[in-house]
Swiss-Prot record:
Belongs to the PAPS reductase family. CysD subfamily. It catalyses: sulfate + ATP + H(+) = adenosine 5'-phosphosulfate + diphosphate. Pfam families: PAPS_reduct. Heterodimer composed of CysD, the smaller subunit, and CysN. This is Sulfate adenylyltransferase subunit 2. The lineage of its organism: Bacteria, Pseudomonadati, Pseudomonadota, Alphaproteobacteria, Hyphomicrobiales.
Amino acid sequence: MPDSRPDTELSNPQSTKPPLDPHLKALENESIHIFREVAAEFERPVMLYSIGKDSSVLLHLARKAFYPGRVPFPLLHVNTGWKFAEMITFRDEIVKKYDLDLIEHINPRGKAENVTPFTHGSALYTDIMKTEGLRQALDAGQFDAAFGGARRDEEASRAKERIYSFRTPDHRWDPRNQRPELWNVYNGQIRKGESVRVFPLSNWTEVDIWRYIQAENIPIVPLYFAEKRPVVERDGMMILAADPRLELLPDEVKREELIRFRTLGCFPLTGAIRSTATTLEDVIAELEIATVSERQGRAIDRDQSGSMEKKKREGYF
């Protein structure tokens, strides 16, 4: 893993690194303010860590918010067992490098029943391994606030979600019953059993994320950069064919393609894109002319119309 400039920046305010663009600096300040507000206001916060680019930026901001101390809350990874191998390797390196407290949770029912995206379909698999698994982990830790890396530009239901997203005791989200947010004033008062999902990156865009990664030299999973990789075409997506658990269907042929991923999740449900972007500059240039959302590469968002809002109402990330 390449060395990361954040270590130098966090420990040396007089670093010679160029100052942030004013737009990125304003976003950074807002996110850091949100982290500190939640840490002061809630008893048991936790940060949802899904290992992708947004989680990497979220972690960097959390480290900045509480420097020179350690991040004062644990990271929670709801593992499904079907993440890209590169993601798990990256996660373990980051946890060790930054001395983080990581909680890993796999839904025991799903594991016992061998729930997979191949045998149960994307909708049921996601409900059991992600939504149910997340609710289990939050209940076990008695967490009253959970940071997430969702952004409003990603998808319609996320566009209308507040920065403080209130959840019922069974973790459900009612978009009709949310509190107004005036400027940077957040109302974190909750009843016993209720909780809040907090989204410090709400006002960031995908391009903002990448420009910040570039400016701060934040480590990310190599899958975001183009490389020749084995793939198969399935359900209108290019699926990475590097895991022996992926069984080829009779009409499928594995082939090498120059690809990268705009979004990372479970490998059987995440589509790659053809790309020649091998550097941060290339990725940013590619995104500046993109006409579709990064979520187009997620099979779980195609289950039905409004599927993301339905999942969020049931307790999804």
